[in-house]
């Protein structure tokens, strides 16, 4: 009798556990395998767990990492072959400790930079302390990397270490050569085996920044005014940036808010932009700076992307940049600066994607970069990646929750 009672208890416990299992079926409608692609579901999907901690497992029973985002989504990586389905399970349990892949922070010690990264690439944008110096840096910057672990924080700490900076300053008085050698040994502008910062932004749109267009002139944004980090790993970094008022068609109180997120495994940030107090529909452009005259770019409004290969550096290789648009854009083209503007901006022009911003709406697109020393040996490989990324946006993974 005791044995039967024990079996009944076990069966009851198993049934209760099964009642709390959430099955997530992912379907890949595209002709491309999707590997470790971050998928999201609403937190309502786990309501039956009644607040219990949970684990997510794949079809082999192995745990997969997940993150609960600021906007109450559960995100996790999925792998599913073209045209197939795969099922993941969510159930009560204690999740394993997973490595942080996507992360970032503000660096007040480096004129308020906000910098972020994942396992593929890193970026930064500029803050109010830089704007106060008068230096012109409008667009998004790229930091290339060739290691999967986070390295941006270490680069800043090494470059800006007060003791090292003081030693360099002293050496400059007595031994300029030694001072230079020490400065180079800690500089993030030199590759010490994990990548570097050698992309130039200046007074341009840099690596895929957007701006309003008035009478064919770009109303360049400057540095952010306020920032708020909304997500900080392990799988997604999200930052909200609010900018100083712009003057647009006589209105001097147009305020841009920019939300940027970067997921693990992706070369591309997601940008969501709004303009408050804008009175009427206004052209908006997303641009990639052309540092030199070049034909090594693609601009395809029909397929919804622009992509560009920056001039190759003989030591550091080549940086590739792109922007991809889930909604239809009006035009995609290269625009060359006038001679005067070339001199002012230190560049040849932009590859631009042109759209229209309607007041009260949001403008969403993806922009990012790759490096010839970390996965993209030539521009052809980069353009292939961008084309597939654009196509995958049109054929998103579908999610069924049971």
Where are these regions (language model features)?
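Polysaccharide-binding surfaces and accessory modules of carbohydrate-active proteins
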Residues: 19-22, 283-336
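Acidic, contiguous internal or C-terminal segments within carbohydrate-active enzymes
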Residues: 225, 229-231, 238-284
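Beta-strand-rich recognition/accessory modules
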Residues: 73-80, 327-402
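Bacterial Sec-dependent N-terminal signal peptides
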Residues: 1-25
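Solvent-exposed beta-strand/loop surfaces of large extracellular or lumenal domains
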Residues: 51-74, 247-251, 292-307, 332-343
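Solvent-exposed N-terminal domain segments of exported/luminal and surface proteins
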Residues: 89, 94-216
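Short, hydrophobic/aromatic-enriched beta-strand segments in well-ordered soluble domains
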Residues: 84-95, 239-243, 286, 322-323, ...
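Alpha-mannosidase-like glycoside hydrolase catalytic domains involved in N-glycan trimming
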Residues: 19-105, 110-111, 136-139, 144-145, ...
